């Protein structure tokens, strides 16, 4: 019998096979604009679906608690060495299962319960693990929030400095999940030093931009840098910590045995593949196109009367304020999904709506750039978004937009070799 992707799954589990085929069709047919998503290479997927998933490897290369780890040691060392080369880090831990666990490990390394931490407000662009009261970070530690200026909708570093001086945090967290502007890590380090605080940068969203040299590198300034390995870095879903050699043992101990047991060696291998891709010259070309696409998309949406938070973007994402249109993020997400355009509802700075409803949507260009979309396609996307957002409950409009989406995505095949 001819072997094709998912041959054995189809034979053994038709229900799951059907769900996965439907998901592949959704990814192929839709315009994927969720800023935290991307399309990995076939090589990354092959590594993640490899025999390495069978191997338990508690510990670190050369210091495992199980035998037979000599070859998974090679995979982990490749991932670590490549990450060091990309970001110029002295030490890298590639074992975190997620960005949240990477953040947790840093907190556990340097903080005690109740310590004061300065982090970005979630509705202003921060992340759950930056002190949200519903997250372990907000429960275990005393987080003080900074946000953006109400006029510029950008970080006001003077305000951050005043908060740091007032509250004397043990740690300052920089980085965001929905902030479209360049972050001044040098200034953050100066603020941290002025009050004797550690600086941790969560670069999950912009790691690919940092790798390509299109955003300042936080490794030069922060005591600790955490990131996911997907998003703009275009690897498997997972996490990573970068730090100075002086913190290496403490960080490694916080990951294992601190908060994790056996690492996911198949995922670490996939990280190694993605890091090799990020070291290639083509990756910089890709990221340059991601940023160019985001700028054009923002300009086109603005020209069509939509309000972009902070007036534009310096990276891969945009925040659209829907209040002038009189619709919610929840409605916009649903309407766009009906038209085959995938986004997520998102709070905007000073949002009067709840996080379950929101007054905005977040848009990213990393995934569709991976499919080959360029400036011309961004203009078409802007036209479709305008059409849907100005007629979110008109079924005829949504159907018409969906047909145009299918025509557009059909020109840029996704994983054609998967049948």
Swiss-Prot record:
It is an enzyme of class 2 (transferase). Keywords: Amino-acid biosynthesis, Cytoplasm, One-carbon metabolism, Pyridoxal phosphate, Transferase. Gene3D superfamilies: Aspartate Aminotransferase, domain 1 (3.90.1150.10), Type I PLP-dependent aspartate aminotransferase-like (Major domain) (3.40.640.10). GO terms for cellular component: cytosol. The keyword Cell membrane does not apply. Its main location: cytoplasm. It is found in: Cytoplasm. The record marks 230 as: Plays an important role in substrate specificity. It comes from the Bacteria. SUPFAM superfamilies: PLP-dependent transferases. One of its GO terms (biological process) is glycine biosynthetic process from serine. Catalyzes the reversible interconversion of serine and glycine with tetrahydrofolate (THF) serving as the one-carbon carrier. This reaction serves as the major source of one-carbon groups required for the biosynthesis of purines, thymidylate, methionine, and other important biomolecules. Also exhibits THF-independent aldolase activity toward beta-hydroxyamino acids, producing glycine and aldehydes, via a retro-aldol mechanism. This is Serine hydroxymethyltransferase. The gene is glyA.
């Amino acid at each position: 019998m001819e072997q094709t992707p998912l041959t054995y799954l189809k034979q053994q589990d038709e229900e799951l096979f059907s769900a996965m085929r439907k998901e592949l069709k959704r990814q192929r047919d839709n315009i994927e604009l969720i800023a935290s998503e991307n399309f990995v290479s076939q090589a990354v997927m092959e590594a993640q679906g490899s025999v390495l998933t069978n191997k338990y490897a508690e510990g670190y290369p050369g210091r495992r608690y199980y035998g037979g780890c000599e070859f998974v040691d090679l995979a982990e060392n490749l991932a670590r060495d490549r990450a060091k080369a990309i970001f110029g880090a002295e030490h890298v831990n590639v074992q975190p299962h997620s960005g949240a666990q990477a953040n947790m490990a840093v907190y556990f390394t340097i903080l005690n319960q109740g310590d004061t931490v300065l982090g970005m407000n979630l509705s202003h662009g921060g992340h759950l693990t930056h002190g949200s009261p519903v997250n372990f970070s907000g429960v275990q530690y005393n987080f003080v929030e900074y946000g953006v200026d109400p006029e510029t909708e950008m970080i006001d570093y003077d305000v951050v400095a005043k908060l740091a001086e007032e509250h004397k945090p043990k740690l300052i967290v920089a980085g965001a999940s929905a902030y479209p502007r360049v972050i001044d890590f040098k200034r953050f380090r100066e603020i941290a030093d002025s009050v004797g605080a550690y600086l941790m940068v969560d670069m999950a969203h912009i790691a690919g931009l940092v790798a390509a040299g299109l955003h300042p590198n936080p490794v030069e300034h922060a005591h600790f840098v955490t990131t996911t390995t997907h998003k703009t870095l275009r690897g498997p879903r997972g996490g990573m910590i970068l730090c100075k050699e002086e913190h290496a043992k403490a960080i490694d101990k916080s990951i294992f045995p601190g908060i994790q047991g056996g690492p996911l060696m198949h995922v670490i291998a996939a990280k190694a593949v993605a890091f090799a891709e990020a070291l290639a010259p083509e990756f910089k070309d890709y990221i340059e196109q991601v940023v160019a696409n985001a700028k054009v998309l923002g300009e086109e949406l603005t020209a069509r009367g939509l309000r972009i938070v902070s007036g534009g973007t310096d990276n891969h994402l945009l925040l659209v304020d829907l209040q002038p249109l009189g619709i919610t993020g929840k409605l916009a997400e649903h309407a766009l999904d009906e038209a085959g355009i995938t986004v997520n509802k998102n709070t905007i700075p000073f949002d009067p709506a709840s996080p379950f409803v929101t007054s905005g949507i977040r848009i990213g260009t990393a995934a569709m750039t991976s499919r080959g979309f360029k400036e011309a396609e961004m203009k078409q996307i802007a036209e479709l978004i305008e059409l849907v957002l100005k007629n979110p409950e008109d079924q005829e409009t949504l159907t018409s937009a969906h047909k145009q989406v299918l025509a557009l995505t059909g020109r840029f095949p996704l994983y054609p070799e998967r049948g």
